[in-house]
A protein has these predicted regions:
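Short, glycine/charged-rich "phosphate-handling" switch motifs in NTP-dependent
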Residues: 112
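C-terminal output helix
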Residues: 42, 119-124
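Acidic, metal-coordinating helix/loop segments flanking the phosphotransfer/catalytic sites
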Residues: 20-23, 36-61
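Conserved acidic segment of CheY-like receiver
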Residues: 5-26, 62-64
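Conserved active-site segment of CheY-like receiver
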Residues: 12-13, 93-98, 118
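A short, hydrophobic beta-strand element within the central beta-sheet of small alpha/beta folds
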Residues: 61, 87-98, 106
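Receiver (REC) domain active-site loop signature in two-component systems and cognate sites
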Residues: 66-69
């Protein structure tokens, strides 16, 4: 049985950080399609099929920053967990925040992992 290709949705408002993630994925030879949303609102639109330009077909994996305008990462994750069509989405937090409160909020929302951005592709 062939598995469907997994699309990676990067939810990141910072252009430099988004480019760094893209380079790290290439360095790790991860060739999955990478799509970017600027914030949580745009990500939800893409996931729910209401975005004007992009609709993602499952399966997908999310890499979500915590600090973003309009709808932050924790708010996005909580919205996804409340949506019966999205609740099983695999989500990793990818952020510069090493704060315990952010880690607790993320794990309370059942993320698969919490990665602190270091700028090093080796740690990614």
């Amino acid at each position: 049985m062939n598995a469907l290709p997994v699309t990676i949705l990067l939810v990141e408002d910072d252009d430099v950080d988004a480019l760094t993630v893209e380079r790290c994925l290439k360095h790790a030879k991860i060739t999955n399609t990478l799509v970017r949303a600027q914030d949580g609102v745009e990500a939800l639109e893409m996931l729910r099929g209401t975005h004007a330009g992009t609709h993602l077909a499952a399966p997908y994996l999310l890499l979500v920053d915590i600090r973003m305008p309009r709808l932050d990462g924790i708010g996005l994750i909580n919205e996804i967990r409340r949506d019966p069509l999205l609740t099983r989405t695999v989500i990793f937090v990818l952020t510069t925040s090493d704060a315990d409160r952010d880690k607790m909020a993320a794990y309370d929302a059942h993320v698969a992992g919490y990665i602190v951005k270091t700028g090093s592709s080796d740690q990614f």
